[in-house]
């Protein structure tokens, strides 16, 4: 997958007025790039997991026709793994979904740590990641919210190690401008699934990665795949 950061434009003279070295401005931009890269990788992995898992009926507990997200529904989703349900070690959900579970008087809401807007908590004895990834909410009739319950190594993101950055200063405008832009790539693998190059292509878009039919299940059993999903009516 290919991604990019920027362009970020600033006037070199601004750093002089602010009495800040140019290196400090580059450091701030670099930190912002690192955060955006991690966010892109996280959201892409979640979108691919939602697509692959929800394309397998045996891995989904869809109660959206009659109900919203509940503790019982989540437990029934775990049951899709049968005697291997203990292998489901992590849950991923949006913030609104998390607060619905809190509102249902779940007592084990211990927060383990927080990184930016991503919270990691404990629900049902499993580590739960709370992040507003777009793929965890789907528009429709009704709108649906999704909780992923995942095994260790459900998704593997690897850096392409081909980050290309360019800083360029240009004349010709009212003020001299410096532009910073960065390109990058990364790879993604899902446990128990393989990417269908014929269907999705060698350089997929976000939409293609989020299409379930582009992920082929290779594991002989759902128990040997990335995990399961609970789908509920977002309005309930």
Go through each PLM region and give its residues.
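Assembly/oligomerization interface modules of large self-assembling protein complexes
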Residues: 1-4
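Structured, hydrophobic secondary-structure cores that serve as assembly/anchoring elements
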Residues: 6-20, 74-110
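A sequence-level detector of short, solvent-exposed, charge-rich linear segments
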Residues: 44, 48, 52, 56, ...
């Amino acid at each position: 997958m290919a991604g990019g950061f920027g362009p970020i434009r600033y006037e070199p003279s601004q750093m002089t007025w602010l009495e800040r070295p140019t290196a400090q401005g580059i450091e701030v931009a670099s930190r912002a790039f690192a955060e955006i890269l991690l966010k892109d990788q996280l959201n892409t992995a979640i979108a691919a997991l939602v697509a692959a898992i929800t394309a397998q009926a045996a891995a989904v507990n869809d109660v959206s026709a009659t109900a919203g997200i509940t503790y019982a529904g989540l437990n029934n989703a775990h049951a899709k793994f049968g005697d291997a349900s203990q292998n489901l070690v992590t849950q991923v959900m949006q913030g609104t979904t998390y607060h619905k579970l809190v509102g249902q008087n779940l007592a084990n809401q211990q927060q383990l740590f927080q990184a930016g807007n991503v919270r990691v908590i404990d629900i049902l004895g499993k580590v739960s990641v709370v992040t507003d990834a777009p793929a965890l909410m789907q528009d429709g009739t009704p709108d649906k919210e999704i909780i992923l319950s995942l095994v260790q190594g459900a998704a593997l993101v690897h850096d392409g190690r081909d980050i290309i950055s360019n800083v360029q200063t240009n004349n010709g405008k009212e003020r001299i401008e410096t532009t910073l832009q960065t390109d990058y790539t990364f790879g993604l693998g899902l446990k128990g699934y393989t990417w269908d190059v014929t269907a999705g292509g060698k350089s997929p878009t976000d939409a293609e990665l989020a299409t379930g039919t582009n992920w082929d299940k290779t594991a002989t059993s759902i128990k040997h795949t990335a995990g399961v999903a609970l789908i509920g009516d977002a309005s309930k």
